[in-house]
Amino acid sequence: MGLFNRLFGKKRQEEKSTTDSIEEAAEQEVTQEKPALLAETAETAESQQSVYEKDVTESQAEQVSDARIIEDGQNSKEPAASGHSVQEHKQQPVQHQQEVFHSENSVAAVQNNTETMPSQQKKDEKPNQSPDFMAEYYARKAELAQKVESQKPAETAEQESQTTLSDQKETETAVNQSEEEASSQIAESVESEEEKYNRSLKKTRTGFGARLNAFLANFRNVDEEFFEDLEEMLILSDVGVQVASTLTEDLRYEAKLEKAKKPEALRRVIIEKLVDIYDKDGQFNEKINFQNDLTVMLFVGVNGVGKTTSIGKLAYKYKHQGKKVMLVAADTFRAGAVAQLAEWGRRVDVPVVTGPKNADPASVVYDGVERAVAADVDILMIDTAGRLQNKDNLMAELEKIGRVVKRVIPDAPHETLLTLDASTGQNALVQAKEFSKITPLTGLILTKIDGTAKGGVVLAIRQELAIPVKFIGFGEKIDDIGEFHSEDFMRGLLEGLL
């Protein structure tokens, strides 16, 4: 919403202010014209009232003059009536006073009527003038409203076009934001292999670093007790007994040369020796032996180490690289293994070759190799049994599988990969030794490295068996597997310790 407000909030406020200003102008125009009409009406009423008052005044004057003429006429008749009695002569002034009083009362009444009539006429005029004024007022108001209404369609059309344009922009912005969010989520979800190494080896690095820091914090003198404590610390870090012994002897030699007397110097020498042990002859042979046509990979290992899961993840990896992949379920004596591999095939959308229950594993493999050749498959992955407790039968089974594969492809299998669980520590080294006696191994798959602090077993395997690690599992996600790179591994294992 913040972007939306930045892009469109200001524009909508301007549109709203424009509409409000038009309505206010119309109201002001009506308000300004209303007093003018009232003033004009008032002037008309005043002029009419003045004319009326003038007429009333003239009529009053005429009435007063008539009353005086009557009075004068009566007075002129009094001398002609001189023959009346004295009593009548005495009563005449009284009658005259009464007439004068009556005349004055009549004049006052006329004046009162004169004063009353304008107000009554005003009251009478107001009903007569009010309809005309209100009619004119409403006519002007209707005219102004009509003007406003005539302007509204154009403004409404403009507002609708602007609203449509803003809605289109809003939609485009929402789409762009969703695309950006999706791309950012994808970018966040897609880690580089170096980042995966750092993440997955965090526990191993933290455990080894904590032990090394605790050891150096208790540093006293470089004596025999010091070397014994150092060897114990390395063994607890799962680097193996042979690696611990070799490193301790090398450090004794360095101490004699007085190159390792201080804690920081000791720390550097220990890490340098660990790197030298893994580097060895500089030949790692970590690359997969891919062929130009069909590459056959044979997977061996005990049950529960993540062998079938690793096959499914690698199938997903290679399929997304554009390669044609096929799987073979040769662990026919364990129904769960066949079902698990079939489920992985469904998930990653690759074909899986299976046989009947308790079928000969070699026959299922032979069928799978022939199908792979006929379908121009790039990579064929074969899942085998892991019954290490019955070494003789397992050895015979693996030898037979190798023979039937060579009938179709003489130089196959091109890779025989042993899957090891890194969390088992030194037990993984024991399994590697046992399987190397049963069948020739070309490489190792190290799984569950992210959930353990025993990643140092790689150094032990490298030191004692000279078998390269070719794949490493970083976690539970479908893409959490990759080719092993020794430099990235050692950096992830030892980074931050110096």
UniProtKB/Swiss-Prot annotation:
Membrane topology: Peripheral membrane protein
Molecular function GO labels: ATP hydrolysis activity; GTP binding; GTPase activity; signal recognition particle binding
InterPro entries reported in the protein's UniProt record: AAA+_ATPase (IPR003593), P-loop_NTPase (IPR027417), Signal_recog_particl_SRP54_hlx (IPR013822), SR_rcpt_FtsY (IPR004390), SRP/SRP_N (IPR036225), SRP54_GTPase_dom (IPR000897), SRP54_N_sf (IPR042101)
Keyword GTP-binding set for record: yes
One BP term from GO: SRP-dependent cotranslational protein targeting to membrane
EC number(s) recorded for this UniProt protein: 3.6.5.4
Major site of localization recorded for this protein: membrane
Subcellular location(s) per record: Cell membrane; Cytoplasm
Enzymatic class: hydrolase
Residue numbers binding GTP: 301-308, 383-387, 447-450
Residue span of region Disordered: 1-130, 147-200
Annotated keywords: Cell membrane, Cytoplasm, GTP-binding, Hydrolase, Membrane, Nucleotide-binding, Receptor
This protein's GO CC annotations: cytoplasm; plasma membrane
Bias type Low complexity, positions: 36-46
Biased composition (Polar residues): 103-120
Disruption phenotype: Doubling time increases for growth under nonstress conditions, unable to initiate growth at pH 5.0 and under 3.5% NaCl salt stress. Double deletions of FtsY and Ffh, or FtsY and YidC2 are barely able to grow in the absence of stress.
Catalytic activity: GTP + H2O = GDP + phosphate + H(+)
Pfam families, per the entry: SRP54, SRP54_N
Protein task: Involved in targeting and insertion of nascent membrane proteins into the cytoplasmic membrane. Acts as a receptor for the complex formed by the signal recognition particle (SRP) and the ribosome-nascent chain (RNC).
Subunit text: Part of the signal recognition particle protein translocation system, which is composed of SRP and FtsY.
Membership in a protein family: Belongs to the GTP-binding SRP family. FtsY subfamily.
Protein known as: Signal recognition particle receptor FtsY
Organism: Streptococcus mutans serotype c (strain ATCC 700610 / UA159)
